[in-house]
């Protein structure tokens, strides 16, 4: 308005809209946390052999929309008195955890805490609002640039995943050979696998700010900005896998 780029009437209309906007970011980005857990146990056997098996399932949906976790676990214990002087105990446990979250730089709860309620989520037509911020992209040297940011656009075009698998086995053997001689074996082995993945798609502001320097789809192949972009197409995928085996 000060630069006479919009009329006073339009300026006052926009001011009135912002004053009454009162966007509830927590309602848009957060939810009530819900979790559930189920367990099944089986016990049986005979005079010489007994066993106990259990199976479990749990899931939780965090207070931030898109923060979800699922876990499965199982356990087996077997005790066997093979001879009066020989006993064996075997234990096996296994768990699998799958967690889903957000891509780099995305935190719905932090955004809800720090963002003004005067910023609208959608415009008068119901379309998402991408509010303007400024940055400089070091590779194209075009000075200050403008980009549009919408938190749901970031959430829909980026993600993180983490999967963990754990298997543990142990075996105990006791053998009373004679009254003055006893043999005992204690052994265990554990397998741990962790796989994490983080992705930011080409439509996110994260890619525009760090790798491209212009809005998605705004530059044609061969333009100066297109040539200067570190990543003119696609997004960023980061993976990490840890595999560990231990025994004693």
Residue ranges and their predicted role:
Residues 35, 46-47, 81-83, 176-178:
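Outer-membrane beta-barrel channels and translocator barrels
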Residues 55-61:
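Transmembrane beta-strand segments that form the barrel wall of outer-membrane beta-barrel proteins
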Residues 52-54, 89:
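Periplasmic plug
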Residues 1-22, 32, 62-67, 73, ...:
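Surface-exposed loop/interface segments of Gram-negative outer-membrane beta-barrel transport/assembly proteins
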Residues 27-29:
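C-terminal beta-signal and adjacent terminal beta-strands/loops
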Residues 40-44, 74-80, 169-175:
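Residues on the lipid-exposed face of transmembrane beta-strands in outer-membrane beta-barrel proteins
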Residues 44-48, 57:
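A generic beta-sheet turn/junction motif
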């Amino acid at each position: 308005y000060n630069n006479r780029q919009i009329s006073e009437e339009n300026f006052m209309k926009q001011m009135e809209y912002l004053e009454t906007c009162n966007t509830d970011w927590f309602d848009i980005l957060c939810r009530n946390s819900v979790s559930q857990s189920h367990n099944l146990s089986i016990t049986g056997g005979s005079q010489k052999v007994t066993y106990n098996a259990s199976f479990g399932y749990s899931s939780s949906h965090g207070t931030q929309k898109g923060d979800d976790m699922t876990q499965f676990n199982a356990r087996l214990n077997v005790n066997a008195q093979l001879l009066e002087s020989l006993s064996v105990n075997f234990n096996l446990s296994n768990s699998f955890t799958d967690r889903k979250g957000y891509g780099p730089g995305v935190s719905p709860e932090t955004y809800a805490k720090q963002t003004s309620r005067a910023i609208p989520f959608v415009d008068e037509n119901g379309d998402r609002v991408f509010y303007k911020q400024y940055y400089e992209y070091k590779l194209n040297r075009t000075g200050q640039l403008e980009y549009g940011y919408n938190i749901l656009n970031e959430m829909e075009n980026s993600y993180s995943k983490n999967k963990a698998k754990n298997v543990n086995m142990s075996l105990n053997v006791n053998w009373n050979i004679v009254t003055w001689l006893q043999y005992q074996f204690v052994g265990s082995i554990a397998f741990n696998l962790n796989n994490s993945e983080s992705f930011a798609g080409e439509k996110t502001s994260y890619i525009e700010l760090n790798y491209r320097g212009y809005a998605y789809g705004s530059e044609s192949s061969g333009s100066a900005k297109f040539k200067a972009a570190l990543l003119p197409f696609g997004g960023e995928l980061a993976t990490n896998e840890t595999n560990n085996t231990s025994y004693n």
